[in-house]
């Protein structure tokens, strides 16, 4: 049976189809007007690639589909979510329990749709506020009171009053969500922000997910599990997924794929960069695991919770190059997949980063996306000449180099800042490059950054889909507490641990998974503030709460944190499903002499340089720059003084030439 892993990005939608022995990488254009079109396009292309007469015939051999995306990320970034109303404690309408005005006010929620309620609101207070919100056209109402966790009785009472007046079956009723249930944490502002982001993005994500589920069932007669990628690096069924938990799930899976490869290679610290059509993402792997942060900004929204550290720069293959103040700039505007770069020949007339790479000779115009799209060099050159070279007063070739160098500078700056935030230096880390355009910049960025080795992957263009392919079903449950680790803590903490375990087991059973076969990771957060936290953990099989507490007690003692306040408890349940990891490459293919093509790597004139075909290179083969490796899944320029070696897993290792 096959597994299918699909990753919907802003420009391209990627898929990885695997039976555990062979893998097939697929890319189609993302369709932002309806994400299920590109979702279905991946399945149709897979059926065609594998020789099945129809998508339905192919899906009959598929045991599982996992889908990660940037759908919620795009909804937040483009500010096109649902109209949401907030009921908060009076006096916090602007700051939402922070010290200054919350950045979501006026962005994710109109200030007129934030209603302050008195400490003990009457039914008249509540319904008057709701009437004002409904007249403002809100589609969801979030109730987020101060100090509503762990005791959320006041929020529940408000919800009961609203639902009594506006029951589900009447016209005009809207969902009422409680911040204490959406984000059961002690930090008031975090509860508001999580609740708001979830309500804001829910409709757009749910529309795509349920439409995909209907398409699979009704059009293709497939009833297997459709699992949705979450930002914790796991997957879950649609009914167990909150919209806010899918933010950046696609890029996060790339980081988890990188962590898998770091452990495979025995690398301790790695900085990853994922270059797509619109953005570049940077992340860190520490000790073989993705680096998480406690507190910070999630999509520019401050929260005090744990999430994968991911940083972005608005530069990608579709980024538009312009001249401002006699210098080249890139982005933030992007041509996307349609009309795309000028070289696509689909009507785009702006010069983009992809056009520059083609003009410099790095791309094979006849083998783009595995030959499924022919690139037009003349259109790329004309766009660069018109939009960059003439305004700068330089040759077309110098203009193309300037575009490339600006991209390298932006990517390097992003990686330097990310390394500094992680308290690492470039000399401490290896560099992983993936995404559709990552390998294109691996050596250039490695040289400028100062790392000793860089890696580009055979599955690099679909690397987030690879991260999904090694993922398991994961659920994370969190409860904020305010306790001291003393003689009475056992009686106080046991009910919380028991409630978390019960919820995890119930959710696994609801997804037809056996809780006894799952792994459970328990964590306790200690600290004097929400921003300065020490975490202890214990990993167990399914156990009674008392056994869990005994294991955590040992961990607390070993960590020496018993004197600090206990701020929260967290449980991650993990159920292993059909994961397909990386295997050493065993096959050998007939050697092929490299071709040649005119390329430009620096200010010198163009010169004919070797072009190695990736599909004809074997383990141990070395290509020395200046050269380029072109293939259906990997294109990697090798500048002078650098070399590329095919490693044991069929990936590319870049290093300075001896």
From Swiss-Prot:
Please name the GO terms of the biological process aspect recorded for this protein, alphabetically.
glutathione metabolic process
Mention any one GO cellular component term assigned to this protein in its UniProt record. cytosol
Q: How is the cofactor bound?
A: Divalent metal cations. Magnesium or manganese are required for activity.
E.C. no: 6.4.1.8
Answer yes or no on keyword Nucleotide-binding: yes
Q: Which reaction does it catalyse?
A: acetophenone + hydrogencarbonate + 2 ATP + H2O = 3-oxo-3-phenylpropanoate + 2 ADP + 2 phosphate + 2 H(+)
Q: Which InterPro entries does the entry mention? A: APC_alpha_subunit-like (IPR053706), Hydant_A_N (IPR008040), Hydantoinase_A (IPR002821), Oxoprolinase-like (IPR045079)
Q: Which cofactor names does the annotation list?
A: Mg(2+); Mn(2+)
Top-level enzyme category: ligase
Q: Which cysteines are joined by disulfide bonds?
A: none
Q: What does this protein do?
A: Catalyzes the carboxylation of acetophenone to form 3-oxo-3-phenylpropanoate (benzoylacetate) in the anaerobic catabolism of ethylbenzene. Also carboxylates propiophenone at the same rate and 4-acetyl-pyridine at lower rates.
Q: What is this protein called?
A: Acetophenone carboxylase alpha subunit
Protein source organism: Aromatoleum aromaticum (strain DSM 19018 / LMG 30748 / EbN1)
**What gene is this protein translated from?**
apc1
């Amino acid at each position: 049976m096959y597994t299918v892993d699909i990753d919907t990005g802003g420009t391209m939608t990627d898929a990885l189809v695997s039976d555990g022995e062979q893998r097939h990488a697929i890319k189609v254009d993302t369709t932002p007007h309806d994400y299920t079109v590109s979702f279905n396009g991946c399945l149709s292309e897979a059926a065609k690639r594998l020789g099945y007469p129809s998508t339905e015939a192919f899906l009959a051999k598929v045991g599982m589909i996992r889908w990660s995306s940037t759908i919620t990320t795009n909804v937040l970034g483009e500010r096109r979510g649902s109209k949401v109303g907030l009921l908060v404690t009076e006096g916090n309408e602007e700051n939402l329990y922070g010290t200054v005005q919350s950045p979501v006010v006026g962005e994710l929620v109109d200030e007129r749709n934030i209603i302050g309620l008195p400490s003990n609101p009457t039914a008249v207070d509540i319904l008057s506020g709701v009437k004002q919100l409904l007249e403002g056209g809100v589609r969801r109402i979030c109730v987020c009171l101060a100090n509503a966790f762990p005791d959320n009785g006041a929020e529940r009472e408000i919800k009961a009053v609203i639902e009594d007046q506006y029951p589900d079956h009447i016209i005009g009723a809207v969902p009422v969500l409680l911040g204490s249930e959406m984000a059961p944490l002690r930090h008031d502002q975090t509860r508001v922000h999580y609740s708001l982001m979830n309500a804001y993005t829910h409709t757009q994500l749910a529309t795509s997910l349920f439409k995909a589920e209907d398409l699979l069932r009704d059009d293709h007669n497939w009833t297997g599990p459709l699992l949705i990628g979450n930002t914790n690096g796991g997957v879950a069924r649609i009914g167990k997924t909150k919209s806010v938990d899918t933010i950046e799930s696609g890029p996060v899976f790339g980081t988890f794929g990188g962590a898998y490869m770091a452990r495979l290679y025995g690398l301790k610290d790695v900085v990853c960069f994922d270059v797509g059509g619109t953005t570049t993402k940077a992340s860190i792997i520490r000790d073989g695991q993705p680096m998480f942060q406690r507190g910070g900004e999630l999509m520019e929204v401050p929260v005090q919770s744990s999430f994968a550290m991911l940083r972005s720069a608005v530069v990608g293959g579709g980024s538009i190059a312009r001249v401002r103040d006699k210098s080249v700039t890139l982005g933030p505007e992007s041509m996307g997949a349609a009309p795309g770069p000028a070289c696509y020949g689909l009507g785009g007339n702006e010069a983009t980063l992809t056009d520059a790479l083609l003009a410099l000779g790095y791309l094979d115009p006849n083998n783009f996306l595995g030959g499924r799209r022919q690139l037009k060099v003349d259109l790329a050159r004309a766009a660069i000449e018109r939009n960059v070279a003439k305004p700068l007063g330089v040759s077309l070739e110098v203009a193309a180099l300037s575009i490339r160098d600006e991209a390298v500078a932006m990517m390097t700056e992003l990686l330097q800042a990310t390394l500094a935030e992680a308290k690492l230096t470039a000399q401490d880390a290896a560099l992983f490059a993936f995404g559709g355009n990552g390998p294109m910049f691996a050596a250039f960025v490695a040289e400028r950054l100062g790392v000793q080795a860089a890696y580009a992957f055979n599955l690099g263009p679909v690397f987030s889909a690879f991260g999904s392919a090694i993922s398991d079903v994961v659920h994370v449950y969190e409860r904020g507490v305010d306790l001291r680790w003393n003689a009475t803590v056992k009686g106080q903490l046991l009910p919380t641990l028991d409630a978390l375990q019960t919820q995890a087991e119930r959710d696994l059973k609801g997804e037809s998974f056996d809780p006894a076969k799952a792994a459970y990771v328990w964590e306790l957060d200690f600290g004097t503030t929400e921003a300065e936290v020490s975490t202890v953990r214990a990993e167990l099989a399914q156990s009674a709460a008392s056994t869990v507490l005994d294991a955590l007690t040992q961990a607390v003692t070993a960590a020496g944190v018993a004197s600090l306040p206990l701020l929260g408890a967290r449980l991650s349940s993990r159920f292993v499903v059909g994961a397909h990891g990386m295997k050493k490459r065993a096959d050998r293919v007939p050697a092929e002499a490299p071709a040649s093509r005119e390329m430009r790597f620096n200010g010198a004139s163009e010169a004919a340089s070797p072009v190695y075909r990736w599909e004809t290179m074997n383990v141990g083969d070395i290509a020395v720059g200046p050269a380029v490796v072109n293939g259906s899944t990997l294109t990697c320029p090798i500048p002078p003084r650098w070399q590329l070696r095919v490693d044991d897993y069929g990936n590319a290792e870049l290093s300075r030439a001896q």
